[in-house]
Structure formats: C-alpha cells, structure tokens
C-alpha cells in the first residue's frame, strides 16, 4: 500500500536507528552456524528428507488419480504405496540395467513409447535433471491418455544433487512455482494445469542442511 519512495524512506530510517526486528546481530543460528550441511545426502542418513514429506503429502492428496495404467521413474514405489485400482505399473529408466524397468528411454526423445498409453504418470524430483524440460513435458503429455494425469514435483530451494563428471547426469534447474506453471501451461493449457508449492523458511533452511 506504500509508494516506493515511502518504503525507501522507512528502510533508510530503520537502518539508521537499528529498528530491525529481530535486531540486527541478535539472531542465534545455533547448529546452522556452519559452512557445510549437517548431512551430505539430504538427510537420508538421519531419517526422511524434508522434501519427501511434502512429496508424499502431495501424492496422498491425489491418490484418486493414481489408477489404471501408471508410469513411474526408477521404481514403482509410489504407485504401489498410493495407487488405487492400478491395472498395470510400468517403470521408466534412462539407461539400461535397472531390473525394475519395463521401458528404457530418454523422455526428451522417446518415439518408441506409444501415444495415449498411461492414465497416470508419477514424475517426482526429476525435471530439474533434464536439460530440456519442455521436451520432457511434451513427451509426458503425448503418452498420457486424453483424460490422464501427470503428478509432477520438482525442487525449489535445495542443494545441487547431481553433478556432471561425478554422476551419470547433472542437475540443471531449480524451478519456482511461476516458472513451472509457465512451461506446464504452454503444453497442457491453463485450464488443465494446477501448481502448488510447499514449505516455509524453516523447512527450506533445514532441507539445505539435510
């Protein structure tokens, strides 16, 4: 409700008279007063990583959509856990060698996966690992049935999980809800795109620390 000039004046006065709250210099960072994270593996060594709490809450809220023929990346764990009336569970993996995989391929270029194949695709924490996310989303759209549902999650505030030269692939993007909405609505349309975000300042800090 305030003009830019008024806001700048108030900010200048707060700095001049040290009117910040909490007072500048009084915050106790406790166990976060460190330059390396508490856990190097997102907290898997200490329990359930915080992002998985939100991911699983999201899937739990959408169990009615995890039905019919479903596709998941890596393993069918979430299909098994949250699916209702699943008739077939397929697993996609990027490279050969995964014994659970029923389909091997790159979602940015996967002509061997037929159109209109799946009622539901669970696509968690992977979009940020794909150099061309729009191409991957176009494939997901193509291989979904006309009334199918894609349940997609991706990292916002998080440490980098994959590095080229150390892992098989890198991590290229961290999305905001706005950017993910933008590229999803380009493909599905505004009416068919629903975006939500999870977390707060404390959970973001804790997730970075593991």
Label each PLM-derived region with a short phrase.
Residues 14-64:
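Class I SAM-dependent methyltransferase Rossmann-like catalytic core
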Residues 46, 163-183:
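Acceptor-substrate binding/catalytic loop of class I
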Residues 52-111:
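Class I SAM-dependent methyltransferase SAM/SAH-binding core
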Residues 108-121:
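A short acidic, Gly/Pro-enriched loop at the edge of an enzyme's catalytic core
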Residues 119-132:
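A short SAM/SAH-binding and catalytic strip from SAM-dependent methyltransferases
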Residues 134-149:
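A short glycine-rich, Lys/Arg-flanked "PGG" loop and its adjoining helix->strand segment in the class I
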Residues 152-154, 158:
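Acidic carboxylate diad motif detector
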Residues 191-210:
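Conserved catalytic loop of SAM-dependent methyltransferase domains
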